[in-house]
Structure formats: structure tokens, C-alpha cells
């Protein structure tokens, strides 16, 4: 019998990101709309539209960092490092535009 090895923290991170998506649906939709507005903008408007998009992305990242750091603070240092690495991996898979450079 072969046991499937589960990724550490997979279940808790999945639940955290599901909850994040529900609780921040409006902000995530704003990010999508801002990206579309930037993509559709005329050259003279593009820089301003991009700035708005970047501000929204930073807000999402700040909230994701808060979620990650809040849970990590309940763990010992070594376990927290493993959790943060697993969180970053799942975040890059699920939300690539938000997870590239979390501190």
C-alpha cells in the first residue's frame, strides 16, 4: 500500500485562501477591472491607469501578508518558516500576480 504524501499545511492554506477570496472578492474584482482598464487605455492614460492597478495589487499583497503573518505568529520559528514557504508556493500557484514578492 502506497501512502500519498500531502503537502505540509495544504489544508489550512487552502482554507485561508478560500476565505480570503470570499472576504476580499470586491478588492480582487477591482484589481481585475483596473488591469482591464490599463490594457484598454489610450497611451496618454496608460500610466495613470497602471498606477491605480499597482495600488490595488499592493493592497491585496498587504492583506495576504497579514493573513500569512498572523497564522505564522502562532507557530514556533522553524514551523513558521515551513508554513511561510508552503503559503508562498500555494499563493504563486493560485494567485500568481499577488504572490511574487511577499516580504
What positions do the PLM features span?
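Amphipathic alpha-helical interaction modules
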Residues: 24-68
Amino acid at each position: 500500500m502506497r501512502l500519498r504524501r500531502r503537502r505540509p499545511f495544504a489544508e489550512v492554506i487552502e482554507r485561508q485562501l478560500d476565505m480570503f477570496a470570499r472576504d476580499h472578492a470586491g478588492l480582487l474584482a477591482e484589481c481585475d477591472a483596473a488591469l482591464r482598464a490599463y490594457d484598454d487605455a489610450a497611451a496618454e492614460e496608460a500610466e495613470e491607469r497602471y498606477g491605480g492597478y499597482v495600488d490595488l495589487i499592493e493592497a491585496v499583497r498587504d492583506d495576504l501578508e497579514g493573513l500569512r503573518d498572523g497564522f505564522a505568529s502562532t507557530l514556533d520559528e522553524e514551523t513558521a518558516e515551513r508554513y511561510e514557504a508552503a503559503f508562498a508556493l500555494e499563493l504563486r500557484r493560485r494567485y500568481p500576480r499577488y504572490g511574487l514578492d511577499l516580504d
